[in-house]
Amino acid sequence: MTIARLQRSVTLADVLVHEAGHAVAAWELGVRIGAIHVHMRVREGRVTFASDVGLGRFPAGSDALRLAIEREMVVLHAGLVAQKRFHYEGACGLVPRTDYEGILATALQVETDLRLIDEWSDYAEERARALIELPQTWRRVEALAVELARRPVLHGKEVDAFLAGVRVPRTANARLAYRRREAKERYCLSHNPEDREPVERAIAAARRTR
């Protein structure tokens, strides 16, 4: 579960992109989505997903368990990463407390050294950045943000069906999502305020047609 409670400088579009970032990352990584809820008037959003961690699905201490935890950490980071990609100035200094609490609680299932958890979280954040930077991922984030303006409550199967139907650009190398250093260096350079305008207009139009 992830909640974004946002400050005055953050727009409704920022909230929608934040939640879309969580959901698209989950969809891309095979983490099952429960539902997305966006409360328009208070600019608050929530994504729930069906965690595979802690259910006894993986042997304790196994590599499979650590990979499942890491996937969920990437999903939890992806909301703020997408928001910064969309509107960097509006996200500066923002701390989505519930996202970070979720990251810590998830990692604590296999690791108790907080220093190592911080390093692991940094790595998961880099993976989230690289994933969100992929053209096809970002196109899905934009499309889902606009759809959430029309339908602020979407359940997992609806999200799956919608994202599967989004037309996305082809990418030459899907492994780009895991090129950590290049993604980190490129991250702040990729933000262009003009990229925000078409999405904000589409969100405004979608709200008028509700």
Predicted regions and their residues:
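Soluble catalytic regions of large protease machineries
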Residues: 2-210
